[in-house]
Amino acid sequence: MKILVCDKTEMDAIEKMRAAGLTVDTKFEITPEELPTVLPAYDGCVVRSRTKIRQPLIDVCPNLKVIVRGGVGLDTIDAEYARLKGITVMNTPKASSASVAELTIGFMLMLARSLYKASASMKAEKWDKKAFEGDELGGKTLGIIGAGNIGKEVARRATLLGMNVIAYDPCISGAEGVKLVSLDELLAQADYITLHVPNPPETTGMLGAAEFEKMKNGVRIINCARGGIINDEALYNALTSGKVAGAALDVYNEEPPLDWKLVKLDNVICAPHIGAATREAQSRVGAEVADKLIEFARK
């Protein structure tokens, strides 16, 4: 079975697949223009968030039997179409959950204590203690939109910090230690709102101007899920008006952003989609990718 690894993947995982008898080629920097001429020769492929597998590409790959996404979301793959064509589509939903959850908590702490502003002030050789009075997370209400693997990990950590945790997720009936509420209830009650949902058409623009109006004044927003879930213009307006006190973003509508005005706001913390970028998560992702492909090849 021939596998093309299109994005950076741990070499231990690649060697594990080869040791199991798979023929594995790596083209970590393959371009969208090259894919239609290269991928048709392969039975399977491994992708991360960079490489997109869309219908036109699937149509020119008659040998393709399996696509494995190293990560959580499948929005970079036309998964339903692939399955209609008899292609198995898999991901690694739990491998990076802890890393994304820890980044989310880190973002909340930075927002609560204005650490990003305090650090910038010190680098400008200013000693301005009185300017950076913050808030404790304990006793605050955290609203989690999406109580799947990552959402549950965030909830567990937030509870240990003494936060009251509520969640909105129409896909589950219960989550340990979390009170499930409607979206409107969450928007009205939360001091911090964090997003952990995929981005199919149903969640695109899920938080827009109308939703921001329902939130508490001074709410803080964290998005480590997908950029399209929040309407950028609505978030920008809420941040500049003071409705939203601060936001922390790891994901964007376009990556890298085409418009940087949101990123440049003083009350926005930002990172270049590093939620899963820990050594531990990358090792788990690679191992799970290898195990899934080896198991598939043995069927």
Regions found by a protein language model. Give the residues of each.
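An N-terminal-biased, well-structured beta-alpha scaffold segment characteristic
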Residues: M1-M90, L186-A188, G208-A210, K214
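Structural/interface elements that position substrates and couple domains in central-metabolism enzymes
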Residues: K2-L4, T9-D12, L22-T26, K94-S99, ...
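Short beta->alpha connector loops at strand-helix junctions that form conserved
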Residues: K27-F28, R48, G70-G71, I87-A98, ...
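Rossmann-like adenosine-cofactor binding region
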Residues: T51-I58, N164, P170-K261, A277
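Phosphate-coordination loops involved in phosphoryl transfer and adenosine-cofactor binding
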Residues: L64, G138-T141, A209, G218
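C-terminal helix-to-coil terminal segments
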Residues: R83, M90-L103, E133, G246, ...
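Phosphate-binding beta-alpha-beta segment of Rossmann-like dinucleotide-binding domains, i.e.
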Residues: K85-I87, P93-T141, E153-R156, L160, ...
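Glycine-rich Rossmann-fold phosphate-binding loop(s) that bind the pyrophosphate
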Residues: A147-G148
